């Protein structure tokens, strides 16, 4: 009789043992069952570390053995309707508040670091219902452009996350960093199972570049010193919802003002012009900021126009279904071309807004 347990059949005289030794068949089958059960237990014992290791790897790589909340960001509320978050936003401050109004998460990070980490911020908070708020800035053109009320007590409430243009007096005559805002109120971050849950917060760009061009069509040479430019508004102080926290009057003055010639080609008529550039905070469709230009020679007002009304004159030319506020939030560059005669009087028959010619009627001076 020969007995092999290493995967070979049991034999008796060269033939299968179980066929020729029936009296012991039941006993041998019991022994085989016992051996197979032992082998099964041993195999399971060997698999346990592998399973544990696999779960560990999923925990680290796939997040299947834990709960992880990730927040991504996008800035596609622009006239190109394309996400420009990574290229235009440079720094970001994120705040999370629970239903009791307590700050439970606060993080400021460079967008380059966010992109390097996968394009998201991991929220180290328990999955629940939270309100999330963001203030963000673009490239630094003026250090300390804004003051943020974000470092108070955790129980102060999300309403205290306001932002104000940093200034000493009423006037601002320098450029401003691009300012962005994001808000998601009472967002449900709860999870039913382990794994990763990703949310995306859209951002709105608040700041706008206003370029004002004064041209003399008759050929008289204009100098930058001939005019003074300003925009009066009350939008310097915004709350956590991106609305006016209160009327806070501000006057924007040019951070760049120069003269030059329009139409440099020989085939074109050369026209003298003065250009002024200003950066203003968020424009509101229900507000009435005024763009004013003065003749410095005699101090007289050349014109005083409602900036928002004139900005909206060409909204329909973009063939997009937008409310007035949506257009003002998407458009961040406005170019206005005005014409004056030799006496520096405004020729108000027509103007150009963002290269669109507009024929004016019932001009509001």
Where are these regions (language model features)?
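A sequence/structural signal for flexible, mid-protein segments enriched
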Residues: 170-268
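Bacterial Sec-dependent N-terminal signal peptides
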Residues: 30, 49-78, 359
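Hydrophilic extracytoplasmic domains
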Residues: 282-365
């Amino acid at each position: 009789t020969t007995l092999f347990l290493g995967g070979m059949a049991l034999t008796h005289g060269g033939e299968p043992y179980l066929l020729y030794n029936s009296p012991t068949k039941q006993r041998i089958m019991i022994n085989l069952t016992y051996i197979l059960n032992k082998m099964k237990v041993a195999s399971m014992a060997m698999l346990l570390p592998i399973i544990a290791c696999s779960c560990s790897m999923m925990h680290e790589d796939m997040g299947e053995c834990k709960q992880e909340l990730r927040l991504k960001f996008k800035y596609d509320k622009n006239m190109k309707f394309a996400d420009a978050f990574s290229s235009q936003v440079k720094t970001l401050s994120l705040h999370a508040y629970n239903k009791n109004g307590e700050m439970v998460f606060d993080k400021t990070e460079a967008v380059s670091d966010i992109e390097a980490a996968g394009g998201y911020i991991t929220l180290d908070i328990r999955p629940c219902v939270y309100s999330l708020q963001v203030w963000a800035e673009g490239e630094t053109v003026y250090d300390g452009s804004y003051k943020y009320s974000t470092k108070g007590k955790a129980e102060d409430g999300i309403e205290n996350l306001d932002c104000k243009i940093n200034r000493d007096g009423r006037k601002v005559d320098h450029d401003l960093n691009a300012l962005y805002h994001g808000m998601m109120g009472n967002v449900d971050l709860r999870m039913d199972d382990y794994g990763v849950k990703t949310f995306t917060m859209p951002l709105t760009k608040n700041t706008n570049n206003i370029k004002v061009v004064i041209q003399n069509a008759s050929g008289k040479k204009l100098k930058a010193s001939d005019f003074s430019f300003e925009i009066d508004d009350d939008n310097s102080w915004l709350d956590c919802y991106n609305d006016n926290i209160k009327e806070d009057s501000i006057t924007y003055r040019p951070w760049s003002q120069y003269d030059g010639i329009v139409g440099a080609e020989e085939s074109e008529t050369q026209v003298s012009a003065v250009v002024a550039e200003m950066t203003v905070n968020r424009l509101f469709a229900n507000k009435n900021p005024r763009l004013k230009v003065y003749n410095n020679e005699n101090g007289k007002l050349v014109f005083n126009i409602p900036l928002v009304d004139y900005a909206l004159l060409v909204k329909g030319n973009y063939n997009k279904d937008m409310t007035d506020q949506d257009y003002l939030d998407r458009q961040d560059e406005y170019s206005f071309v005005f014409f004056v005669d030799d006496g520096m009087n405004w020729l108000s028959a027509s103007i150009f807004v963002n290269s669109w010619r507009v024929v004016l009627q019932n001009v509001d001076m």
